[in-house]
């Protein structure tokens, strides 16, 4: 975050950039804020809740400008930033990971842990629009009712203009009765 002093460990050194793992914040920015999500520390669904919303927006705009410049050689100027809502409940699309828990003999539903394939099971997500967040528990229940739930890959949820949509990725043959 701009203005912060941190201790970090270099994890990957590329030709034009590097990656580091934060170890300790030595001097936090006065703009740093407490994340509102209880899963923030472990979940990989979002990583900018500690930034004020204005800095989140400018960071995203800079990223889009950089991509257009590097990949297409275009200077797009200052694009208009459109956000569904302020703070929480703004994300209209998500991909939920599904994992079969052999010990509990059930499907776990959540998001991938940050920088990992491990699953962080969640019951709700405050970043999602409320209609999608409310679907997480019913989706988990549905997955556990399917005969072939071990073959589920992931679920994508999208809040369209006409309501929520769900795309289920299935990696095998659906079980008898699963298509009803």
Model-derived segments and spans:
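Accessory RNA-recognition modules of RNA-modification enzymes
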Residues: 1-180
